[in-house]
UniProtKB/Swiss-Prot annotation:
Quaternary structure and partners: Belongs to the TFIID complex together with the TBP-associated factors (TAFs). Binds DNA as monomer.
Protein name, per record: TATA-box-binding protein
An annotated GO BP: DNA-templated transcription initiation
Species of provenance: Mesembryanthemum crystallinum
Family as reported in the entry's similarity comment: Belongs to the TBP family.
Source organism superkingdom: Eukaryota
InterPro entries linked: TBP, TBP_CS, TBP_dom_sf, TBP_eukaryotic
SUPFAM superfamilies registered for this protein in UniProt: TATA-box binding protein-like
Transmembrane stretches, start-end: none
GO molecular function terms listed in the Swiss-Prot or TrEMBL record: DNA binding
Amino acid sequence: MAEQGLEGSQPVDPIKHPSGIVPTLQNIVSTVNLDCKLDLKAIALQARNAEYNPKRFAAVIMRIREPKTTALIFASGKMVCTGAKSEQQSKLAARKYARIIQKLGFPAKFKDFKIQNIVGSCDVKFPIRLEGLAYSHGAFSSYEPELFPGLIYRMKQPKIVLLIFVSGKIVLTGAKVREETYTAFENIYPVLTEFRKNQQ
């Protein structure tokens, strides 16, 4: 849990975060290969925190409370873990799921653990003129307010998708390492200040 407390209490590193804002990690998606075939029906019957409805979805959905996460476990032995708030927590959760599967009698291993997506968010605390931003950054932006209230900004370097809302709230998704989230935010921050709405 130590990881989560860091952002609020420690001074922000001005070299890594010149804006003074550190995006908060909201969700980590990771994958791991348990490297053995699994009987999903048997798992669902024996594990109390599992649900399996093969007509709806071809995986067992399992949840644990600490770290609060959800796993999708496939018959091939592949597993997806979502919901953790840090990379370490995601790995810890994935290990816990692997251990549950082992305890049910399957020779589960822990191969090729990989972070697939990091979702972060932050608030620049000022409103943004999305029309102006979309117009001047047309190559990267799509903004259709009648379909979705946010501007979708597809950054090339790092390859991150940002959802930018008029309120100044930002969601960043697509990172494989948290530094990409931070870099993407620092890249967009000067653009956001440029399109700051003047308060009436």
